Structures are given as C-alpha cells and as structure tokens.
C-alpha cells in the first residue's frame, strides 16, 4: 500500500515560507492580512526575479495601496531592511469626514475601563512638529529664499490640550479608521506596527507621533 501524502496548496507553502523569513524581509504587522488574501487567491504566484511577471499586475491590484510596503512579502520586489526604519517610526494619517466632537469628549472624560489609553498633551507640542515640517517643505520648494520662517500664533493654543486615544491591541488600518469614526474622532494615525491612535477635535495636527498601544509596541 502506498503511503498517503498530505497535499498542501502552493499558496499555503509560500505563505509559511514568507512568514519565517527574518523581519527585515517583510513587514508582517502591516501586510499579513492582505498578503494572505492575495496568496490564497493565487494572484501573486509568479516570480519577476526569474523573468516571469505574468501575474504582476493582478498581484499589484490585489495589494492595492499596500503594494509599496508589501511587495517584498510576496517576492515581487527586493527585500527591505526594516531594522533601519522600524514600523513604529512610520504611520499613515487621515482626516475623518464626519467627526462628532461631543461624543469624543464624552468618551474620553475621566477614567475608563475600556481597552484603550487616553493621553493628553499641550497643543503647542503638535505645533512645534508641524512648524518644523512646514519650514522644511518651504525651504525645499523655494531654495533661493533664505531664512524662511513660519509664523504661527501660539497665544490661543497655549491653553488648549490635545487628547488622543490609543487602543491597547494591534488592529488593521481599516479597523483603526472604523473604530476612530465610531468614537467621534476628527482624525486617526495608524502606525505601521498596527498601533491605532484616534485624534480628538482640539488637536491641530495628527496627534502624537509616539506609539503607546500597550499590547502593540513593536
């Protein structure tokens, strides 16, 4: 009697091999869900490095906006060295179209027993980062002008505080957006290690650039 063998789909084998690679080869926190979907659908099976790019377009369409960050996870582009720029130092931000300031304030007042961490800091801390960025961009766009300065009034902002909420656990960027919308936030910041930050109505910029999700710090 011939021994029976367990037939494992090629997509599953590829997924396993990708996930055991060193971290500098693939941003697992950012890409896991979408890469799994594309591999299961067998849309990223070809190998451009071997001269076969028959599936490249389909794979790119499947990964969508995550193509730039995740193409190395499916062997479509050269691996990146994420040790130089850890996921916690990168983030995606977006304004939410229909914020509900009163709801956000009500949910973040006082101590809560929910699975999130409320952080409040002066708005001027946001403005200092924002001014540095604007000044740098104006200098790049107008190199012929020297001593470019950005004038921002701090008189009113000094009394204002920016309140943000960090969810304890890691989540996808879609879940981050939905969760922040459901609590009335004005904006959200999703760190590329999957930490989610909801930004309150008093914040001028996009909240804090520091990861503070208690169960999602790496």
UniProtKB/Swiss-Prot annotation:
Residues 1-25 form the signal peptide. GO terms for biological process: regulation of BMP signaling pathway. Its main location: secreted. It is found in: Secreted. InterPro entries: Tsg. The N-terminal domain is sufficient to interact with bmp4. Belongs to the twisted gastrulation protein family. This is Twisted gastrulation protein homolog 1-B.
């Amino acid at each position: 009697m011939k021994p029976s063998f367990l037939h494992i789909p090629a997509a599953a084998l590829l997924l396993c091999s990708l996930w055991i690679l060193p971290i500098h080869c693939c941003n697992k926190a950012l890409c896991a869900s979408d890469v799994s979907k594309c591999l299961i659908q067998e849309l990223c099976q070809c190998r451009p490095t071997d001269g076969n790019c028959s599936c490249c377009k389909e794979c790119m369409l499947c990964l969508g906006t995550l193509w730039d960050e995740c193409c190395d996870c499916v062997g479509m582009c050269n691996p990146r060295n994420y040790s130089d720029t850890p996921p916690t130092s990168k983030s995606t931000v977006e304004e939410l179209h229909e914020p509900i300031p009163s709801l956000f304030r009500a949910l973040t007042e006082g101590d809560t027993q929910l699975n999130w961490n409320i952080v409040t800091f002066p708005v001027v801390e946001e403005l200092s980062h924002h001014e540095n960025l604007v000044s740098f961009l104006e200098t790049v766009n107008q190199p012929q002008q020297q001593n470019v300065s950005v004038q921002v009034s701090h008189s009113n902002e000094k009394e204002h505080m920016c309140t943000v909420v960090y969810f304890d656990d890691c989540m996808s960027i879609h879940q981050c957006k939905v969760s922040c919308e459901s609590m009335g936030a004005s904006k959200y910041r999703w760190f590329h290690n999957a930490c989610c930050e909801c930004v309150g109505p008093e914040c001028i910029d996009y909240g804090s650039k520091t990861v503070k999700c208690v169960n999602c710090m790496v």
